[in-house]
Amino acid sequence: MRRELLLEKIETYKAVMPWYVLDYYQSKLAVPYSFTTLYEYLKEYKRFFDWLMDADLTQAPKIADIDLSTLEHLTKKDLEAFVLYLRERPSLNTYSTKEGLSQTTINRTLSALSSLYKYLTEEVENDQGEPYFYRNVMKKVSTKKKKETLASRAENIKQKLFLGDETLAFLDYVDKEYEQKLSNRAKSSFRKNKERDLAIIALLLASGVRLSEAVNLDLKDVNLNMMIIEVIRKGGKRDSVNVAGFAKGYLESYLAVRQRRYKAEKQDLAFFLTEYRGVPNRMDASSIEKMVGKYSEDFKIRVTPHKLRHTLATRLYDATKSQVLVSHQLGHSSTQVTDLYTHIVNDEQKNALDNL
């Protein structure tokens, strides 16, 4: 979604929200949370407040009038009823054959609500220096996680990674072979964005940054001499990220055409740009996801930018056998998250079994 459209949608949601959600929005914007994250959270709050009104758990005539007392006095049973509503809602439509929302989607909804409740009960201060209320019912609502061993998850993910020589082979394919399959009209569009697209893919494969971190990169954040980029991690922490040397040529090629091809002026700070009717804009997450999916599907298998992050992490662990180094590269505060990569590259167990 283009940044301008995203901001418009955010303003639309803000216009119907209670004052304390607007306070929450301002607080998280200062962290800063990304606009994409805040947009998704506002969507979840709208859905939740709509349900409160439909379920007669508030007497407010509109969402903006739902008071803090309503949230404070919701019970665990109320929240469980909301979860059940999310899980079964589509099946209530006579014309729909869909199952309920996935557990992943439900968990995301509950995560958004947990963030709001934590703000209201712990983080915010009223005139007396106290939170708005103390009872956090979200702490009593459990989420169901998909049961899967690390080994099983690693095996599933491994099929969608570009390991070994495939990392550079993927870039070479986009650079030299992809165009051969295109019509003349499609070739024109491809050639216009070729350097940019290659630079994005190379950066993701060479640094392991999150999609949102790549989207929010500005020119000032990229140091090609040192091969370091500055990003805003989750939680608003600024971090310096090393970039593998193989990405340098692709990034330099893009920078050589960025200003001319995308009509960039001094005020256009975004590193990755798109151009529509002569107006440059920051390239959005959705466009990058589609671009990565398009090229990867033609090369081997359709993947997301997050799988390119997994690719870098796996290759880095394979080369160093250091979970600490990998966790630092990815911006994680502990090595627990990187346990997955030890399973992806762990061939010792298989070799031992083969020798029995």
From Swiss-Prot:
The active site is at R210, K234, H306, R309, H332, Y341 (o-(3'-phospho-dna)-tyrosine intermediate). It is found in: Cytoplasm. One of its GO terms (cellular component) is cytoplasm. FtsK is required for recombination. GO terms for biological process: cell division; chromosome segregation; DNA recombination. It holds the Pfam family Phage_integrase. Residues 169-354 form the Tyr recombinase domain. It comes from the Bacteria. Keywords: Cell cycle, Cell division, Chromosome partition, Cytoplasm, DNA integration, DNA recombination, DNA-binding. Residues 16-121 form the Core-binding (CB) domain. GO terms for molecular function: DNA binding; tyrosine-based site-specific recombinase activity. Gene3D superfamilies: 1.10.150.130, Intergrase catalytic core (1.10.443.10). Belongs to the 'phage' integrase family. XerS subfamily. NCBIfam families: PRK05084.1 (NF003462). Site-specific tyrosine recombinase, which acts by catalyzing the cutting and rejoining of the recombining DNA molecules. Essential to convert dimers of the bacterial chromosome into monomers to permit their segregation at cell division. This is Tyrosine recombinase XerS.
